[in-house]
Amino acid sequence: MGRLSKLRIVDPVLTNLAIGYTNAEFIGQSLMPVVEVEKEGGKIPKFGKESFRLYKTERALRARSNRMNPEDLGSIDIVLDEHDLEYPIDYREDQESAFPLEQAAVQTATEAIQLRREKMVADLAQNPNSYAGGNKKQLSATEKFTAAGSDPVGVIEDGKEAIRTKIGRRPNTMVIGASAYKTLKAHPQLIEKIKYSMKGIVTVDLLKEIFEVENIAVGEAIYADDKDRFTDIWGANIVLAYVPLQRGGQQRTPYEPSYGYTLRKKGNPVVDTRIEDGKLELVRSTDIFRPYLLGADAGYLISGING
């Protein structure tokens, strides 16, 4: 064992903090849920309409078995990335602190890596080049949801139908950018539909009923650039997708057809600590992952909600 390996101590308590930590504002996992893989590289299925094909399964007496065509299933090469951040704690800070600095360090480093993951998912999902022509729509000046007479319900229905005609299933997930959600809450068409509800205002739960999509998440996360300018990670867009729901306590696998997955190397995230120069404790969070959009036919991007 090398000297550095001896100095670094994997802390199971801090690692469990990192594993259990989630920020409610990060919703990328709704579109590309995390699944564990054994290695940092390899091949996994890429899902097209063939993955959602309805096969003839009835078999007559003494007839041949119905055979699937394995060539229907494509694959892509995957390579995962290591993400790590370390947080320094001076021994004097540790002595004077009124709260546990190690836990604060884990939370800060873990949230920063999760923010990076959220941005990676959002960039993939909101990139028009990720979709075929029939699976995306850029709203015109008269179609944008801030325009008088615009029809959000009709636009969403068209997107749902586009997915259904490609994969035979309706989308069960919708991600709405924060600024798009603000527009939807004030849209006359939606207010008219809920005017007799007890709440009287458009909420996510009411949108689930109006749009008939069981899982809706609003992307509230923001990030700051090098000049401390803040920007929404999720823009004025809506993403519809089919993402299989997790069944009970079963772990997800990358082999079930889905819009996308975030592939993570098994055993991550990990938190370790080491001492530098006798006066600094470095608390380091490491995660190995990469999001992949594997079934573009199972997604639909609506851009330009606010024009």
Curated annotation (Swiss-Prot):
Keyword set includes Secreted: no
Keywords: Capsid protein, Host cytoplasm, Late protein, Virion
Compartments in which it is found: Virion; Host cytoplasm
A GO CC annotation given for this chain: host cell cytoplasm
InterPro entries reported in the protein's UniProt record: Lambda_capsid_assembly
Family under the similarity heading: Belongs to the lambda phage major capsid protein family.
Job description of the protein: Assembles to form an icosahedral capsid.
Protein name: Major capsid protein
